[in-house]
Design a protein with these regions (language model features):
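Structured, amphipathic secondary-structure segments that form assembly/contact surfaces
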Residues: 1-4, 8, 18, 22-140
């Protein structure tokens, strides 16, 4: 297996889940794409956020969420990873930076058009998601 694709798959699922503009069609599109790359643990996270009104809140407040990968720790023998990143949440009056750490494992699956590298993220979970900095935006 070529391990050079692994960080891209891990980054891609995080991009789909955590880069969210206030656009319901785009959010549905990215979540649909994400579900091809993650097992039921990803669907459970999505459903929990949806039930809590997370996506409706993004639309209602015109918040823009962006994710930035700091690093990925990967163990080739177990195919386990830990993702370290930051999320930027821009709202009308402030910008919030959050620290995000997730973990999971990659499992080989048949390649498909929707999963061209044939890697499924399993047992995906959020280990840390905390505020690290908040800035008030200047109104001119």
């Amino acid at each position: 297996m070529k391990y050079k694709y692994l960080p891209n798959n891990i980054k891609k699922i995080h991009h789909y889940f955590f880069t969210l503009p206030p656009d319901d069609k785009y959010i549905r599109y990215t979540m649909e794409k994400a579900m091809y790359l993650v097992d039921e643990t990803g669907l459970a996270q999505y459903n929990t956020l949806k039930e809590r009104g997370f996506y409706s809140n993004i639309l209602g407040t015109s918040a823009v969420f962006s994710i930035f990968c700091d690093s990925i720790r990967f163990d080739k023998s177990t195919m386990e990873f830990t993702y370290y990143g930051r999320q930027r949440i821009e709202r009308r009056s402030n910008i919030l930076m959050r620290e995000l750490v997730t973990a999971g494992q990659l499992r080989r699956v048949p390649r498909t058009e929707n999963n061209p590298h044939g890697l499924l993220i399993v047992n995906w979970r959020t280990l840390l998601n905390k505020d690290i900095e908040q800035k008030t935006k200047s109104n001119y």
